[in-house]
Amino acid sequence: MALIAPGGQQTLVDARGVVRVLAGDERLNFRPSVDVTFGSAARAYSGRVLGIVLTGMGTDGREGARLLKQGGSQVWTQDEASCVIYGMPMAV
């Protein structure tokens, strides 16, 4: 399954493995947030997730990728040469 989160909202996987799209939390800098999605997937599918981080600015995804890796999942990132902005892949 591939998840693509709609702008301004959060996409997460609940404990039963159900994908939920919720209103974005105004306290978070990013909506959607890769950290929210990856973190929830790490809890729901420990060790059975492939996280992919493509071009983007900032550090969103760093904490979620750490949780995925900690649980035994893989995280792939785009290489610097092909990125428009290497911020997110570099942060992971």
Language model: regions and residue ranges:
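Conserved acid/base catalytic micro-environments in cytosolic active-site loops
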Residues: 1-91
